[in-house]
Amino acid sequence: MLNSFKLSLQYILPKLWLTRLAGWGASKRAGWLTKLVIDLFVKYYKVDMKEAQKPDTASYRTFNEFFVRPLRDEVRPIDTDPNVLVMPADGVISQLGKIEEDKILQAKGHNYSLEALLAGNYLMANLFRNGTFVTTYLSPRDYHRVHMPCNGILREMIYVPGDLFSVNHLTAQNVPNLFARNERVICLFDTEFGPMAQILVGATIVGSIETVWAGTITPPREGIIKRWTWPAGENDGSVALLKGQEMGRFKLGSTVINLFAPGKVNLVEQLESLSVTKIGQPLAVSTETFVTPDAEPAPLPAEEIEAEHDASPLVDDKKDQV
């Protein structure tokens, strides 16, 4: 009964105006009132402030500053294995698995369209048909900066206007085509593991979505699809990001969806729906080995060892003596 009421509110409430109001309030400096709101939020959601670079809630001038607070580097170490892709966000996995042609699993018994998620861009969709996806939900208590799973060169960004439904587990199980309906920012990267899309999905009360290369993408909410492109490789104007580097952030909210090309990566076997995610931990492994970390060096053939012994030294030991 309660869940039905909550779902009804999702359709009845003026989500856009609520989101604008929340964004406006979260950006205001209100002194003691700001601190009070932050303290209540920390207590209610059990936010671990010991992980933050600034653990004192009085150091945040606005609620938004608190919400996108940076963490201390050592609390999210990045897996350095070049064959491993890492988790892009703190949260829980909503769903993950194989993309079945054009179908992505939203919740048990509910699929949505890959092409619809990508705003009807069939050329981009073709890159990921029968590939792999991971959907990560960020709850209010989580760190809300989003990082790179691997090294990447940005090629395209698309802003897609849409609804602002909540993206929690209740709505994911009950609102059809949720992620293809909500406002979102699609980022396409060239990587060592083939093309990768990282999609930042908005929701109710999500005041803004930002990227490190373009700043605030939304608001303003103009109701039209916008598209930007960047050059490949090391050309002038290209945007290159490293594994584990921040690429964007939410000011309240939301969900991150990753898409990988078919045959390029295998998801870590232990991961399943509702698995907890932490930035920097293993998410997937390449199907091809680029470098074997900590591998024992192969022994030199005997003839090469003898040749090394016979070679003249690069430094004259006698000359260097004092």
Swiss-Prot record:
Site feature: Cleavage (non-hydrolytic): G253, S254
Topology of this chain in the membrane: Peripheral membrane protein
GO function term, MF aspect, one: phosphatidylserine decarboxylase activity
GO cellular component entries: plasma membrane
Catalytic residue list: D90, H147, S254
Region (Disordered): 293-322
Cofactor binding note from Swiss-Prot or TrEMBL: Binds 1 pyruvoyl group covalently per subunit.
Comp. bias regions, Basic and acidic residues: 308-322
Broad class of where this protein is predominantly found: membrane
Keywords: Cell membrane, Decarboxylase, Lipid biosynthesis, Lipid metabolism, Lyase, Membrane, Phospholipid biosynthesis, Phospholipid metabolism, Pyruvate, Zymogen
InterPro entries in the cross-refs: PS_Dcarbxylase (IPR003817), PSD-B (IPR033177), PSD_type1_pro (IPR033178)
EC supergroup of this enzyme: lyase
UniProt keyword Membrane present: yes
Post-translational changes noted in the entry: Is synthesized initially as an inactive proenzyme. Formation of the active enzyme involves a self-maturation process in which the active site pyruvoyl group is generated from an internal serine residue via an autocatalytic post-translational modification. Two non-identical subunits are generated from the proenzyme in this reaction, and the pyruvate is formed at the N-terminus of the alpha chain, which is derived from the carboxyl end of the proenzyme.
Pfam families for this protein: PS_Dcarbxylase (PF02666)
Cofactor(s) needed: pyruvate
Catalytic activity: a 1,2-diacyl-sn-glycero-3-phospho-L-serine + H(+) = a 1,2-diacyl-sn-glycero-3-phosphoethanolamine + CO2
Pathway: Phospholipid metabolism; phosphatidylethanolamine biosynthesis; phosphatidylethanolamine from CDP-diacylglycerol: step 2/2
Compartment list: Cell membrane
EC number(s) given by UniProt: 4.1.1.65
Classification via PANTHER family: PHOSPHATIDYLSERINE DECARBOXYLASE, PHOSPHATIDYLSERINE DECARBOXYLASE PROENZYME, MITOCHONDRIAL
Known function: Catalyzes the formation of phosphatidylethanolamine (PtdEtn) from phosphatidylserine (PtdSer).
The protein's assembly and partners: Heterodimer of a large membrane-associated beta subunit and a small pyruvoyl-containing alpha subunit.
Family indicated by similarity: Belongs to the phosphatidylserine decarboxylase family. PSD-B subfamily. Prokaryotic type I sub-subfamily.
Protein name: Phosphatidylserine decarboxylase proenzyme
Annotated organism of origin: Escherichia coli (strain 55989 / EAEC)
